[in-house]
Design a protein with these regions (language model features):
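PLP-dependent aspartate aminotransferase-fold enzymes
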Residues: 78-161
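N-terminal glycine-rich, Lys/His-bearing helix-loop that initiates the first secondary-structure elements
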Residues: 1-88
Length: 161
C-alpha cells in the first residue's frame, strides 16, 4: 500500500530515470514522454547544460521568498520583458498557482482600474483542467473533479468548439 494520497488512480508504470525526451522504467523499457509531467516539464531530462546550471545553483541558493531580491530572478524577468509585451513577470511554482494569480489579477483590474464591483465574470471552457485548487476547479467547470460540494462564483463555461 502506498502512503501517497490517492487523488486519482495511478498507472502501474514506474519510471526510474529520463534522458532527453525519453523515460525509462525499472526494466529498462524506453517511453517517449508525451505527458511532460502533465505539460510542465517540457525541458526533457538530463540535458548536460541544464544539469551543470542546476548544480551550480544548488551550491548557492535553493529557494528564497520573493520578498527578497534574487539576482538570477531579476535577470530572467528583465529578459522576458525585453522579448515580450510585458512590463512585469510573476513567477509561479505551478500551473495551478498561475491560474489562481490570473483570476486575482483579472478581478483586481476590474475592481480597481474600472471601478466595477459587478464585472467579475471569467469565461472558461467546460471540461478544462486548470489544477486542483477551488479557483482552478471553478474555472475548469470539470464537475467530476469537484467533489467538495462547493464552487466559487463568477465563472461562465462555454463549450470548446
Amino acid at each position: 500500500m502506498s502512503n501517497v494520497l490517492p487523488t486519482y488512480p495511478r498507472s502501474g508504470l514506474q519510471f526510474t530515470h529520463g534522458k532527453g525526451c525519453y523515460l525509462y522504467d525499472e526494466k529498462g523499457n524506453e517511453y517517449l514522454d508525451f505527458g511532460s509531467g502533465i505539460a510542465v516539464n517540457s525541458l526533457g531530462y538530463s540535458h548536460p547544460y541544464l544539469n551543470t546550471r542546476l548544480k551550480e545553483q544548488l551550491e548557492k541558493l535553493w529557494h528564497l521568498s520573493n520578498v527578497y531580491k534574487i539576482p538570477e530572478q531579476e535577470k530572467l524577468a528583465q529578459r522576458l520583458c525585453e522579448v515580450s509585451f510585458a512590463d512585469y513577470v510573476f513567477f509561479c511554482n505551478s500551473g495551478t498557482e498561475a491560474i489562481e494569480a490570473s483570476i486575482k489579477i483579472a478581478r483586481r483590474y476590474f475592481h480597481q482600474t474600472l471601478k466595477s464591483k459587478t464585472k467579475n465574470e471569467i469565461i472558461s471552457f467546460t471540461g478544462s483542467f486548470h489544477g486542483r485548487t477551488l479557483g482552478a476547479l471553478a474555472a475548469g467547470g470539470f464537475s467530476k473533479l469537484n467533489t467538495f460540494n462547493t464552487t466559487i462564483e463568477g465563472f461562465t463555461q462555454i463549450d470548446f468548439a
